[in-house]
Amino acid sequence: MGTFVGVIIVLFVLGSMMALKPNGIDQRLDKLRMTARRLQLNPKLVSCPDWIKGKDNEYGRGMLGQYCLVLDDVQLPHTRYQVIDGQWRPDSSFIDTTKDDVKLTIPSTIRTNNSTNNNNTITKKTNFSLDKAPLDLPVSIEPFVKGLLTKANSIVIYWEDIAYVRPSSNPAYQQKLIEADLLVLKKQLEKWASEMQK
C-alpha cells in the first residue's frame, strides 16, 4: 500500500512539472516576438481594433499581433488600411468624402484637441498612396496580415502572428526563417512609409 501511494505521489509531481512547461506553439511565438523586438519592430498582443476583421471574420473580435516600426525624422499622415484581395485598401469607415471631393471630414473619435473651437473639423484629404498597393510580404506572413495604421512617426501592421507559428495554419514554418521573414516585413514597412511621404 505504501508503494502504491509513493507511485501516485511521484506521478502527481511529474504531471505538475509537465503542466508547467510551455507548449511548442508558445515557445515558437516567444521566439518570433523576441526576434521582432531585437529588430525594433516593437511587437504587442492587442485586442483587434474595431475597423479590422478579426476572429470569425467579425470586426473587432479576438486578439492580434501589433508590430510597430518607429521612424525617426518622419511625419506620416494618419491613415488606416485593410487587406482586400492581397492589396491595401483604405478603411472605408475612416473616410467621409460625401461633403466635398477635395476635403476629408475627420470623425470625432480622432479629432485633435486643438479643434475644440471648431465643431466641423475639415482637413485636406489624406494621402492614400498605398491604395491598391500589393502586400509583397513573405508567403508565410502575407495570408495573416489584417491591417495597417500610420500615425505621426510610426507605421503599425496588424497580423495574426500566432498563425505564423501554428503548424496547422503554416505547415512550412521553419525557425531559421523567422529573422529573414521579419527583415522583409521591416523593409516593406520602411518602403510603405517612404511611399506615403512622396
Annotate each PLM feature:
Residues M1-L39:
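N-terminal signal-anchor transmembrane alpha helix of single-pass membrane proteins
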Residues T3, V7, K53, G60, ...:
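Short alpha-helix boundary/capping motifs
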Residues S16-M18, D50, L104:
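Hydrophobic transmembrane signal anchors and adjacent membrane-proximal interface regions, especially
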Residues Q27-L32, I52-K55, P134-L135, I141-K146:
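Intrinsically disordered, low-complexity boundary segments flanking structured domains
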Residues L41-E58:
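Short extracytoplasmic
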Residues G60-K191, E195:
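Structured extramembrane domains adjacent to transmembrane segments
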